[in-house]
Amino acid sequence: KQVTQFNEGILPWAIQNPVALVFDEYDAGRPDVMFVIQRVLEADGNFTLLDKNKVIKQNKFFRLFATSNTVGLGDTTGLYHGTQQINQGQMDRWNIVTTLNYLSLDKEMEIILSKNKNLNNQKSKEKVANMIKVASLTRKGFMAGDISTVMSPRTVLHWVENTEIFKDTGYAFRVTFLNKCDEIEKNTIAEYYQRCFGEELPESLLNIQI
């Protein structure tokens, strides 16, 4: 004998339990779909299951979090294609909004070394520190409007891993990040590299013959 049984989804289940539910990439959700959490965002918001004629009361320890690359206004930079503009009525219901900026050099170094134990020596630490400094310059350059591509901590980690593969820091930088950049910005980014490592890349103006 076969029996069809209804099981509640992740949201109804989480609401009834002492759970911290995180919506990752929240701004990638379609606004008409995200309306389902509108009532949940109220201080004592309950969740209604219309197909079961059931109202679910929130557990007093239930918490809802969300992460996004935008602040609900849509993609104003062109870097996060696929994100949506979030309904402002829903944005108004989030009682705390905070910004997570890039990590400090020491924290970023700690993460990279934790994933690459063999680099835990003085020489390797100096090299990784210079890599993070290059990334920091791209972030400042992006904020200043000088370049349109930025190095994330993930990119730095890939650069470190590729350096281990190719045994060449400059080449690894080019295939990890520089080749993704706009052609007219490559000289600026090559300059960032030169400032930190004291070496010229082929993309540097000094190596371009007119």
Annotate each language-model stretch with its function:
Residues 1-210:
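C-terminal regulatory/interaction module of P-loop NTP-utilizing enzymes
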